[in-house]
């Protein structure tokens, strides 16, 4: 969640599943001793270019997804998905909430998420994803704070031909 706790860093349009484990989780998660939130994102559209735009008094977002190589039966394919959110609570607050802190809610955030997925005809796949989440708090008379979370990652599934073994990572 962002600095004021009302907005998630994850765009719900990119989520495939979210699982929360408070105890008793498997070795799949390493030696964790605390709770785990396992977030899985979906792949982009494999057949058509598609998008979504949304705006509210607090934020706006867009999502764009589509094939890099269109899906065909028994052939490899690839897709992309990108999502961006931006808040303008700092700008809209004086009009919507003039009674709160003299109309000043000095919070802004932005979220960027992207994922590329490549699928082979035989079932193997690899995904490369990245994110950039930013928060800013600007109390004009006293202090300003800003922080960023960035990350890159990969996930793969290897299905060797003629083998009963699957390699996942």
Task: Identify the residue ranges that each predicted region occupies.
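Short active-site oxyanion
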Residues: 48-52, 79
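Transmembrane beta-barrel architecture of outer-membrane proteins
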Residues: 5, 15, 32-34, 48, ...
């Amino acid at each position: 969640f962002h600095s004021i706790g009302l907005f998630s860093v994850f765009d719900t349009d990119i989520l495939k599943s979210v699982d929360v484990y408070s105890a008793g989780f498997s070795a799949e998660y390493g030696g964790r001793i605390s709770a785990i939130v396992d977030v899985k994102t979906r792949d982009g559209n494999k057949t058509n270019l598609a998008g979504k735009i949304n705006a509210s008094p607090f934020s706006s977002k867009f999502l764009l997804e589509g094939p890099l190589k269109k899906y065909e039966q028994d052939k490899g394919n690839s897709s992309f998905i990108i999502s961006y959110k931006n808040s303008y609570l700092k700008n809209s607050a004086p009009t919507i909430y003039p009674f709160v802190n003299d109309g000043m809610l000095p919070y802004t955030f932005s979220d960027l998420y992207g994922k590329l997925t490549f699928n082979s005809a035989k079932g193997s796949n690899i995904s490369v994803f990245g994110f950039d989440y930013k928060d800013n708090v600007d109390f004009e008379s006293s202090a300003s704070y800003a922080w960023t979370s960035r990350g890159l990652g990969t996930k793969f599934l290897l299905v060797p031909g003629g083998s009963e073994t699957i390699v996942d990572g």
